Amino acid sequence: MFIINLLLYIVPILLAVAFLTLVERKVLGYMQFRKGPNIVGPYGLLQPIADGIKLFTKEPLRPLTSSVSMFIIAPILALTLALTIWTPLPMPHTLIDLNLGLLFILSLSGLSVYSILWSGWASNSKYALIGALRAVAQTISYEVTLAIILLSIMLINGSFTLKNLLITQENMWLIVSTWPLAMMWYISTLAETNRAPFDLTEGESELVSGFNVEYAAGPFAMFFLAEYANIMAMNAMTAILFLGSSLNHNFSHLSTLSFMLKTLFLTFMFLWIRASYPRFRYDQLMYLLWKNFLPLTLALCLWFISIPIALSCIPPQI
């Protein structure tokens, strides 16, 4: 029974990820005054299936000088972590109900750094290694602000449990009272998932494709699926943290629909930002985090610690 539950959880995520690539190409196409994919199937709807078949039936090539085991393990690890992040998310029911759900997600997003580093190092290519080092530095840096923002949310919530966030936001979304945190969280998730305007890891003009430049066929598809699964997971997290369900829990179907619509809207914003903004310089990226976001998040964290204590309204410890 657990295997069936697992498949019912993983297959829709992979399908959503596949069609997200189509939505991205369509959105970017229309924003650049062109059609996007429109040949394979009606309105190009079968394009992701054609892409998947093409990638998984090709011969997986690897450089002669690469480290074989690490080269193969890296994409598998990336996809496994990207799918595991979804397990504690309440939609409104979870696959695994964890007391420390927020910490679990944070630690898994930290582990994804290893798959990037291994892929860059195992490829034995200078472009892949430079892309991997950039990605690791960027991901580790922005995890600092993500962790502090999560700590602030936990102080308001009174617990690390994700389901408790839905109860906290029954009357009012947290984005209303914590909009500076929400803004910094959203920008940090863009950097964490290596999306435009922070896609310095795969700068086409300098690094061709970044850390996965030597990958082809199935392993490349795994990295691709992992990247888009992470994007959707981060947007699902944003929806839970700041736009939590304000519906009655007796109507779980409506709650799920509301949650998915919020996630889709946030994902569409990712695509809109990609079409609108040019890439940051690397020094600007780091300056934004260490000089702007970090002091602000620390100050707001202190604010959320001191105000409940000063007003004697400490949140309930569940």
From Swiss-Prot:
The chain crosses the membrane at residues 2-22, 70-90, 100-120, 136-156, 172-192, 223-243, 253-273, 294-314. Keywords: Electron transport, Membrane, Mitochondrion, Mitochondrion inner membrane, NAD, Respiratory chain, Translocase, Transmembrane, Transmembrane helix, Transport, Ubiquinone. Its main location: mitochondrion. It is an enzyme of class 7 (translocase). One of its GO terms (biological process) is mitochondrial respiratory chain complex I assembly. It catalyses: a ubiquinone + NADH + 5 H(+)(in) = a ubiquinol + NAD(+) + 4 H(+)(out). It is found in: Mitochondrion inner membrane. The keyword Mitochondrion applies. InterPro entries: NADH_UbQ_OxRdtase_su1/FPO, NADH_UbQ_OxRdtase_su1_CS. One of its GO terms (cellular component) is mitochondrial inner membrane. GO terms for molecular function: NADH dehydrogenase (ubiquinone) activity. Pfam families: NADHdh. It comes from the Eukaryota. The keyword Phosphoprotein does not apply. Its EC number is 7.1.1.2. Core subunit of the mitochondrial membrane respiratory chain NADH dehydrogenase (Complex I) which catalyzes electron transfer from NADH through the respiratory chain, using ubiquinone as an electron acceptor. Essential for the catalytic activity and assembly of complex I. HAMAP family: NDH1_NuoH. Core subunit of respiratory chain NADH dehydrogenase (Complex I) which is composed of 45 different subunits. Belongs to the complex I subunit 1 family. This is NADH-ubiquinone oxidoreductase chain 1. The lineage of its organism: Eukaryota, Metazoa, Chordata, Craniata, Vertebrata.
